[in-house]
Structure formats: structure tokens, C-alpha cells
Amino acid sequence: MTEQVWNFAGIEGGASEIHGAVSTTAGLLDEGKASLTTLASAWGGTGSEAYQAVQARWDSTSNELNLALQNLAQTISEAGQTMAQTEAGVTGMFA
């Protein structure tokens, strides 16, 4: 029988890395949007309207992705904490 070994610090570290990636990605998206907003302000007509529609879809999709990643990180963190509590409880039964 193989013994299960859990690296709780590693699990939490992985969740933190995902949170960090979300923050970095959000910052880069904001920076890119600021640059594009400057460019788009000089643009007029139907091309501008089409661009704004695509930009709105991009914004929505990138927000959904970041929310999904935040939820993933939170779920990983909570699962690690639950497993740590479970292991502590089981260990306590045999102490």
C-alpha cells in the first residue's frame, strides 16, 4: 500500500501563483486597453463602432477568464486547507 503524502505549502503556493498571474494579467490588460483607448479616440465612423464592439467582447471574455482563474485559485486553496484539517484530525485519532 502506498502512503499518501500531501504538500500543503506547495498547494497553497500554487494557489498563490495563480492569484499572482491573475493580477499580472489584469495589469497588462489594463495597460493595453489604455493604449488602445488613446488610439481609438482618434478613430471615427463605422470602423470605430466595429472596433468598440470587438473591444467590448474582448473585455468581457478577459474578465470571465480572470474570474475563472480566481475561482480556481480559491478552490485549490480551500481544498488544501480542508485536506490539512482532515489529515490533522485523522492523525489525532492515532496519537
Curated annotation (Swiss-Prot):
Give the subcellular location. Secreted
Is Secreted given among the entry's keywords? yes
The entry's cellular-component GO terms read:
extracellular region
Question: Could you tell me which SUPFAM superfamilies the record lists for this protein?
Answer: EsxAB dimer-like
Please state the protein's primary subcellular location: secreted
Q: Where is the signal peptide?
A: none
Q: What does this protein do?
A: An exported protein. Unlike its M.tuberculosis counterpart has poor pore forming ability in artificial liposomes, does not undergo conformational change at acidic pH. Mutation of 2 residues to those found in M.tuberculosis (25-TA-26 to IH) alters the properties of this protein so that it inserts into liposomes at acidic pH, forming pores, like its M.tuberculosis counterpart.
What does the miscellaneous comment read?
Answer: To improve over-expression in E.coli the proteins were cloned as a single protein in the (non-native) order esxA-esxB with a cleavable thrombin tag.
Q: Which NCBIfam families match?
A: WXG100_ESAT6
Q: Which family does it belong to?
A: Belongs to the WXG100 family. ESAT-6 subfamily.
Q: How does it assemble?
A: Forms a tight 1:1 complex with EsxB. An artificial EsxA-EsxB heterodimer interacts with EspA.
| Protein name in UniProt | ESAT-6-like protein EsxA
According to its UniProt entry, this protein's organism is Mycolicibacterium smegmatis (strain ATCC 700084 / mc(2)155)
